[in-house]
C-alpha cells in the first residue's frame, strides 16, 4: 500500500514532458500491444477527431499536429496500449491469488508495477516510454466484478483482446472515453479529485451493492492510473449504458434544473447531439409513458439511488437517457428497402448481470438465466405522446461530484444572480428531491392502458403489448402520479422489498406495499410467515402465477377429502393482531378454547376468532355459524370467502362481510 501524491499536471500543464514527436513515433505500438491490427472502426474514430479547429483544448483533452487526440500530451493510441498492458498484467496476477473476504484495508490498497520498455522478469517488452501502472483497491474491485457475474477471463478478453474504440463525441467534461469492441465496458479518464473521491466512496458503495444490486448507479469495475513522464492519467472502467449496436434516435442529459439546461446551437449541429431538460420538456411535454409495473419498479429504483447519493453528499449527477424509436426504425428500414432484420447486427448477450436498463430495475438476469433480449435489447419499453413504441436505455452518471467548498461557492454565486432553486449546483438533499420529482413526474409517467405481457420464457414485464394511441390523444391528468401514490414509494430499506436471492421467481417486480402503514404491513408479513399467514392480492382464479409474499393457505387437503378431526384443544385457535400507533405488532395464539377476543378501545387493534375448516366440515350448519361469527367481528383482518373453505388474511379488510363470490379479491 502506498500513499499517492497528486502530480503537478493536475494544476499546471508545464513540466518534464517528452516531446510530442517522440510520443507520436511511439503511438503506432498500441495495436501491437494487443497483438492485433487496429479495427477499421478505431481508425475511423481517431481520424474523425481532427478538424479545422485542431489544437484546441478542452480540459486535458486536445488534438496534436497529426490530428490525433491527446490527453495530457499523451496520444490516445499510446494511452490505450498502456491501459491494455497494465490491466492484462494486474488482473492476471490477481486471479492467481486465492479468493477471500473483503477487508476494510482492501479499499485503500494501491498496487504499483513498473513497465520498462525493454521488459523485466514480470512484464513484457513494449515500444512505449517507461511507465508505471497503478491499480486501486484490486481485491475490492475483484469482488465487485464477481458480484456482477464478470469472470476474470471475460474481463481480460473484452478489454485486452481487441483494440479499444475511442468515442468521437465524448462530451464537454474534457475526458476521453473508450468502449470495448463487444460494447461491454466504458473506460473514462477522470481527474485526481474524482479518483480520490471514488476511493473514499468504495466502502459505502460496497455496502450499497450488497443490499441492492438492482441500481441505476454506475457499475465500477476498476480504477487504474498510468504514470509516465511526470503525468498521472487515471481511468475508471464502468458499464456501458448506451450500446452502439442499438441506434439511439434521441439522447438526453437530465438533471431536473432549468438554468442553462438547453442544448446549445453548436451541440445541435452534431450528428448525435445531447439534449437537456428544457429540450425534453419542449419536445416531449407528455413525457415517456410506462406500464404500471415498470413505472413502479423504475420509480422505486430511482428513489433508492437518490437516497444513497444524498447520504454520500453527492450532487450534480445526471440521468443519461437514450431513446430508440422502434416505429421510426422500422420506417427507416422500409425506406431503405430492407425486408428483414436478419442481416442486421443483433446485440449479443452481455456478460455482466444487471448491466441493462431493464435488468437494473428488475434484476431479471439473476441465477445465471439469460433474458430474451431480441425484442427489447435490454431497453425499457415505453411509448411517447404520439403512440410510438420506444426502448429506453438509462443510467445515472457523473456521481463523482461531492458538495465541497468549490461547489458551495459556485451555488452561492449563481444564486445571487439567478433563482437558487433553478441552478444545477445545489445542496445534496435539495438536489436529490428535485431530481427525483422531475424524473417521476415529468420524464416518466404511468399509463394504465399499457399492459405487460410475459415473454417466451414467462418473464413478466420483459415485453410490452402496446395499445396504439391516436396522434391527437391527450394525456390524462389521472395518469400523473398523485401525492398519495408518491408517498407509497417511500423507502423502508432495501430489505423491505423482495430480493433476487429470495425463493420464488427472481424476475418479478418488487411488490408495492399497501398504503396501510407500509412498515407495519411488512412486519406482519414477516412475522406471520411462521404461522403460514401471508398477504394476498389476487385469487388463484385470476392468475396462475402468484407473486412472492402473496399466498393462500388451504386448511383442507387439495384432493377435497375431509381431514381427520384433530384433538379438541387444537380445533379452536385465536389469533390476535394488535396494531398500535407505534407500528408494533403482537401475535398471540392461545391453545385454550375459552380464550377471549381482545379489542383495543381506541380501535387501533383488531381481534378475530377463527375456527379451522376441519371443525367446520364435521359440524352441521357450518356456513351459517361462520357467517354469524363474521358479523360479530367489528373490524376483522381475516375473512372467509363464501365460495371456498379457506381463510384469507388481508391487513386492509375492515368490512364485517365477506366479499361476494364473483369478486374473488381482497379489498387491498
Curated annotation (Swiss-Prot):
PTM annotation (Phosphothreonine): residues: 668
UniProt modified residues of type Phosphotyrosine: 639, 649
GO cellular component: adherens junction; cytosol; endosome membrane; focal adhesion; nucleoplasm; phagocytic cup; plasma membrane; presynapse
Tree of life domain: Eukaryota
Renumbered residue ranges of the record's region Mediates interaction with TLN2: 641-668
Record EC number: 2.7.1.68
Subcellular location: Cell membrane; Endomembrane system; Cytoplasm; Cell junction, Focal adhesion
Residue positions, PTM Asymmetric dimethylarginine: 459
Catalytically driven reaction(s): a 1,2-diacyl-sn-glycero-3-phospho-(1D-myo-inositol 4-phosphate) + ATP = a 1,2-diacyl-sn-glycero-3-phospho-(1D-myo-inositol-4,5-bisphosphate) + ADP + H(+); 1-octadecanoyl-2-(5Z,8Z,11Z,14Z)-eicosatetraenoyl-sn-glycero-3-phospho-1D-myo-inositol 4-phosphate + ATP = 1-octadecanoyl-2-(5Z,8Z,11Z,14Z)-eicosatetraenoyl-sn-glycero-3-phospho-1D-myo-inositol 4,5-bisphosphate + ADP + H(+); 1-octadecanoyl-2-(9Z)-octadecenoyl-sn-glycero-3-phospho-1D-myo-inositol 4-phosphate + ATP = 1-octadecanoyl-2-(9Z)-octadecenoyl-sn-glycero-3-phospho-1D-myo-inositol 4,5-bisphosphate + ADP + H(+); 1-octadecanoyl-2-(9Z)-octadecenoyl-sn-glycero-3-phospho-1D-myo-inositol + ATP = 1-octadecanoyl-2-(9Z)-octadecenoyl-sn-glycero-3-phospho-1D-myo-inositol 5-phosphate + ADP + H(+)
Modified residue annotations for N6-acetyllysine: 265, 268
Biased composition (Low complexity): 526-535
Main location: membrane
Modification after translation: Phosphorylation on Ser-650 negatively regulates binding to TLN2 and is strongly stimulated in mitosis. Phosphorylation on Tyr-649 is necessary for targeting to focal adhesions. Phosphorylation on Ser-650 and Tyr-649 are mutually exclusive. Phosphorylated by SYK and CSK. Tyrosine phosphorylation is enhanced by PTK2 signaling. Phosphorylated at Tyr-639 upon EGF stimulation. Some studies suggest that phosphorylation on Tyr-649 enhances binding to tailins (TLN1 and TLN2). Acetylation at Lys-265 and Lys-268 seems to decrease lipid 1-phosphatidylinositol-4-phosphate 5-kinase activity. Deacetylation of these sites by SIRT1 positively regulates the exocytosis of TSH-containing granules from pituitary cells.
Disease: Lethal congenital contracture syndrome 3: A form of lethal congenital contracture syndrome, an autosomal recessive disorder characterized by degeneration of anterior horn neurons, extreme skeletal muscle atrophy, and congenital non-progressive joint contractures (arthrogryposis). The contractures can involve the upper or lower limbs and/or the vertebral column, leading to various degrees of flexion or extension limitations evident at birth. LCCS3 patients present at birth with severe multiple joint contractures and severe muscle wasting and atrophy, mainly in the legs.
Assembly description: Interacts with TLN1. Interacts with TLN2; interaction stimulates 1-phosphatidylinositol-4-phosphate 5-kinase activity. May compete with beta-integrins for the same binding site on TLN1 and TLN2. Interacts with ARF6; interaction stimulates 1-phosphatidylinositol-4-phosphate 5-kinase activity. Interacts with AP2B1. Interacts with AP2M1; phosphorylation of PIP5K1C by CSK disrupts the interaction; clathrin competes with PIP5K1C. Interacts with CDH1. Interacts with CSK. Interacts with PLCG1; interaction is abolished upon EGF stimulation.
Known role: Catalyzes the phosphorylation of phosphatidylinositol 4-phosphate (PtdIns(4)P/PI4P) to form phosphatidylinositol 4,5-bisphosphate (PtdIns(4,5)P2/PIP2), a lipid second messenger that regulates several cellular processes such as signal transduction, vesicle trafficking, actin cytoskeleton dynamics, cell adhesion, and cell motility. PtdIns(4,5)P2 can directly act as a second messenger or can be utilized as a precursor to generate other second messengers: inositol 1,4,5-trisphosphate (IP3), diacylglycerol (DAG) or phosphatidylinositol-3,4,5-trisphosphate (PtdIns(3,4,5)P3/PIP3).
Protein name: Phosphatidylinositol 4-phosphate 5-kinase type-1 gamma
Gene that this polypeptide is encoded by: PIP5K1C
Amino acid at each position: 500500500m502506498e500513499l499517492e501524491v497528486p502530480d503537478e499536471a493536475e494544476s499546471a500543464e508545464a513540466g518534464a514532458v517528452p516531446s510530442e514527436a517522440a510520443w507520436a513515433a511511439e503511438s503506432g505500438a498500441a495495436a501491437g500491444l494487443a497483438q492485433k491490427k487496429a479495427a477499421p472502426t478505431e481508425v475511423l474514430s481517431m481520424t474523425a477527431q481532427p478538424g479545422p479547429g485542431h489544437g484546441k483544448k478542452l480540459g486535458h483533452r486536445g488534438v496534436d499536429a497529426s490530428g490525433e487526440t491527446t490527453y495530457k500530451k499523451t496520444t490516445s493510441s499510446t494511452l490505450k496500449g498502456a491501459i491494455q498492458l497494465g490491466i492484462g498484467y494486474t488482473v492476471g496476477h490477481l486471479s492467481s491469488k486465492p479468493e477471500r473476504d473483503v477487508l476494510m484495508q482492501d479499499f485503500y490498497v494501491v498496487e504499483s508495477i513498473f513497465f520498462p520498455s525493454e521488459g523485466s522478469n514480470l512484464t513484457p517488452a513494449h515500444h512505449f516510454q517507461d511507465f508505471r501502472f497503478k491499480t486501486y483497491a484490486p481485491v475490492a474491485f475483484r469482488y465487485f466484478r464477481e458480484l456482477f457475474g464478470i469472470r476474470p477471463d471475460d474481463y481480460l478478453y473484452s478489454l485486452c483482446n481487441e483494440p479499444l474504440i475511442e468515442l468521437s463525441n465524448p462530451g464537454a467534461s474534457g475526458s476521453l472515453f473508450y468502449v470495448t469492441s463487444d460494447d461491454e465496458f466504458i473506460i473514462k479518464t477522470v481527474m485526481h479529485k474524482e479518483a480520490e473521491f471514488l476511493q473514499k466512496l468504495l466502502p459505502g458503495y460496497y455496502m450499497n451493492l450488497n443490499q441492492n444490486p438492482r441500481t441505476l448507479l454506475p457499475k465500477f469495475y476498476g480504477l487504474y492510473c498510468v504514470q509516465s513522464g511526470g503525468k498521472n492519467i487515471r481511468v475508471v472502467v464502468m458499464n456501458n449504458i448506451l450500446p452502439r449496436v442499438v441506434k439511439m434516435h434521441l439522447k438526453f442529459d437530465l438533471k431536473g434544473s432549468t438554468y442553462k439546461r438547453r442544448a446549445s446551437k453548436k451541440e445541435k449541429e452534431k450528428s448525435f447531439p445531447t439534449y437537456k431538460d428544457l429540450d425534453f420538456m419542449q419536445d416531449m411535454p407528455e413525457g415517456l409513458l410506462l406500464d404500471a409495473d415498470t413505472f413502479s419498479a423504475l420509480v422505486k429504483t430511482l428513489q433508492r439511488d437518490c437516497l444513497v447519493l444524498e447520504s454520500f453528499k453527492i450532487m450534480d449527477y445526471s440521468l443519461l437517457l437514450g431513446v430508440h424509436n422502434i416505429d421510426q426504425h422500422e420506417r427507416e428500414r422500409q425506406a431503405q428497402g430492407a425486408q428483414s432484420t436478419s442481416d442486421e447486427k443483433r446485440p449479443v448477450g452481455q456478460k455482466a448481470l444487471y448491466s441493462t436498463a431493464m435488468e437494473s430495475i428488475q434484476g431479471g438476469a439473476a441465477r445465471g438465466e439469460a433474458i430474451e433480449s431480441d425484442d427489447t435489447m435490454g431497453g425499457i419499453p415505453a411509448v411517447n405522446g404520439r403512440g410510438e413504441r420506444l426502448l429506453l436505455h438509462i443510467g445515472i452518471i457523473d456521481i463523482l461530484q461531492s458538495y465541497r467548498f468549490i461547489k458551495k461557492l459556485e451555488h452561492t454565486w449563481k444564486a445571487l444572480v439567478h433563482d437558487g432553486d433553478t441552478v444545477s449546483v445545489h445542496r445534496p438533499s435539495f438536489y436529490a428531491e428535485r431530481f427525483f420529482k422531475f424524473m417521476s413526474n415529468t420524464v416518466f409517467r404511468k399509463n394504465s392502458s399499457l399492459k405487460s405481457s410475459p415473454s417466451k420464457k414467462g418473464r413478466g414485464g420483459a415485453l410490452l403489448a402496446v395499445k396504439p394511441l391516436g396522434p391527437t390523444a391527450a394525456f390524462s391528468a389521472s395518469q400523473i402520479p398523485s401525492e398519495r401514490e408518491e408517498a407509497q414509494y417511500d423507502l423502508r430499506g432495501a430489505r423491505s422489498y423482495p430480493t433476487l436471492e429470495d425463493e420464488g421467481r427472481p424476475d418479478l417486480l418488487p411488490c408495492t406495499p399497501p398504503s396501510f402503514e407500509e412498515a407495519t404491513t411488512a412486519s406482519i408479513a414477516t412475522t406471520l410467515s411462521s404461522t403460514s399467514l401471508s398477504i394476498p392480492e389476487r385469487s388463484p382464479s385470476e392468475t396462475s402465477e402468484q407473486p412472492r409474499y402473496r399466498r393462500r393457505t388451504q386448511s383442507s387437503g387439495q384432493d377435497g377429502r375431509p381431514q381427520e378431526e384433530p384433538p379438541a384443544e387444537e380445533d379452536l385457535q385465536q389469533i390476535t393482531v394488535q396494531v398500535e400507533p407505534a407500528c408494533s405488532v403482537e401475535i398471540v395464539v392461545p391453545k385454550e378454547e375459552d380464550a377471549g377476543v381482545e379489542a383495543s378501545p381506541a380501535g387501533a387493534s383488531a381481534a378475530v376468532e377463527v375456527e379451522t375448516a376441519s371443525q367446520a366440515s364435521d359440524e352441521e350448519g357450518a356456513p351459517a355459524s361462520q357467517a354469524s361469527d363474521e358479523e360479530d367481528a367489528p373490524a376483522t383482518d381475516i375473512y372467509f370467502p363464501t365460495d371456498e373453505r379457506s381463510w384469507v388474511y388481508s391487513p386492509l379488510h375492515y368490512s364485517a362481510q365477506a366479499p361476494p363470490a364473483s369478486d374473488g379479491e381482497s379489498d387491498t
